[in-house]
Amino acid sequence: MEIRAAEISKVIKDQIANFGTDATVTEIGSVLSVGDGIARVHGLDNVQAGEMVEFANGVKGMALNLEADNVGIVIFGSDAAIKEGDQVKRTGTIVDVPVGKGLLGRVVDGLGNPIDGKGPIKADKRMRVEVKAPGIIPRTSVHEPVQTGLKALDALVPVGRGQRELIIGDRQTGKTAVAIDTFINQKAANAGDDESKKLYCIYVAVGQKRSTVAQIVRQLEENGAMEYSIVVAATASEPAPLQFLAPYTGCTMGEFFRDNGMHAVIVYDDLSKQAVAYRQMSLLLRRPPGREAYPGDVFYLHSRLLERAAKMNSDNGSGSLTALPIIETQAGDVSAYIPTNVISITDGQIFLETNLFNAGIRPAINVGLSVSRVGSAAQTKAMKKVSGSIKLELAQYREMEAFAQFGSDLDASTQKLLGRGARLTQLLKQPQFQPMPFEEQTASIFAGTNGYLDTVATTDVSRYEAAMLAYLRSDHPQVLAAIRDSKDLGDDTKKALVAALDAFAKIFA
């Protein structure tokens, strides 16, 4: 075989001339120590705070502590396969997640990866998990109602689009049930084509049991609500960093709707567990502890999340993101650190009480302590007209109830007040998964506040309400339609409703 030097030199010259200069340069560090989901890494001198990094085995992490000689990284996965000396490389990207309508009907983890076995997600784009909340100028005041379908809420503690309304109570008081009923109640609005009426739903499960999350997904599917909902699940068995990140992930998905002129409601279930996960991470990163061993910035953890819920003005698309954060109290103690923090951040709170729940008053809302700081601005005109007096009557009832326990001989007016209060309390009860359209709520509360229940036995109130609404649907559908279409209780509609209720009173027995 003859060696042709000229040919070989030509090939070498061609190789040199066509050599690709686009070599990829990645900054690589090495693990100094690892344990409890935290890695200390040396050599990542230019890493950004909040940047994603990748370990040798493919597990991702996020740089949280930038110190003089090393970087504290929280690991989004198991640290079992990571050992001292392993390589860690920068990705150059801040944590981002897929967003868009392609996520509706799906269950994803804290990083937006699908965990429901329905294949990859068709996302419109990816957005950063940590962004600044909208400023003051792009916002407008809350003025459109979120119809929860729960009489006690829509009448007494109204929630508006763009509001932050805290749901707070002990374990097993029905906090999640309030949120799920709100989701189910959006079915009729989301079935239409009017994008301004639709309300997309996002449920973020933080530190919940997997069985609980599976049950919630099943309930949403059975009630036809999953098709317009997204579930973000960082369950109790997930690492603390994912439980910390999940609410921000869900919020980013909700912001896609808010910033594109659509409306969304997001439930964080619950932020107590997120704070616990963040406390765990902070202590392991050796940040100084404060009250109840939470780090000093635990208020900022929740405020920067909840400030992203907003109602945008018409120049910015008129979209909205409504937040319903949930906080679990211990033995009804709302003066603990995290509950007081979140109460001060939100625009009102819904108190759920164990003794009301056990007494059969469900939803177990303490009407006296619950408040909406947006108030009647978030109600339809019809609901505003009928619910004004119910608040006063229930307040008087609660005040009198305390005195009535001492004295037996009460005058007629006090007895009447106590009787009506007891009937109104019965009227506000509602079974789970049965949200009520607002026109039917209006008719119910109108009947309660205008004396139609005064002759009905307290035990028969629920039966009266069901029969009365069935009668209106069958014999007077035009009354309900008028309330639904005008969202008001005009004089003509009111006369027709009074006539219908008078006619029903004669046949109810």
Curated annotation (Swiss-Prot):
Annotated catalysed reactions: ATP + H2O + 4 H(+)(in) = ADP + phosphate + 5 H(+)(out)
Binding site for ATP: 169-176
Gene3D superfamilies in UniProt: 2.40.30.20, ATP synthase alpha/beta chain, C-terminal domain, P-loop containing nucleotide triphosphate hydrolases
SUPFAM superfamilies reported in the protein's UniProt record: C-terminal domain of alpha and beta subunits of F1 ATP synthase, N-terminal domain of alpha and beta subunits of F1 ATP synthase, P-loop containing nucleoside triphosphate hydrolases
Site (Required for activity): 370
Location within or outside the cell: Cell inner membrane
InterPro entries per record: ATP_synth_asu-like_sf, ATP_synth_asu_C, ATP_synth_asu_C_sf, ATP_synth_F1_a_nt-bd_dom, ATP_synth_F1_asu, ATPase_a/bsu_AS, ATPase_F1/V1/A1_a/bsu_N, ATPase_F1/V1/A1_a/bsu_N_sf
Pfam families registered for this protein in UniProt: ATP-synt_ab, ATP-synt_ab_C, ATP-synt_ab_N
Topology in membrane: Peripheral membrane protein
Cited function: Produces ATP from ADP in the presence of a proton gradient across the membrane. The alpha chain is a regulatory subunit.
Subunit structure, interactors included: F-type ATPases have 2 components, CF(1) - the catalytic core - and CF(0) - the membrane proton channel. CF(1) has five subunits: alpha(3), beta(3), gamma(1), delta(1), epsilon(1). CF(0) has three main subunits: a(1), b(2) and c(9-12). The alpha and beta chains form an alternating ring which encloses part of the gamma chain. CF(1) is attached to CF(0) by a central stalk formed by the gamma and epsilon chains, while a peripheral stalk is formed by the delta and b chains.
Name of the molecule in the record: ATP synthase subunit alpha
Gene (name only): atpA
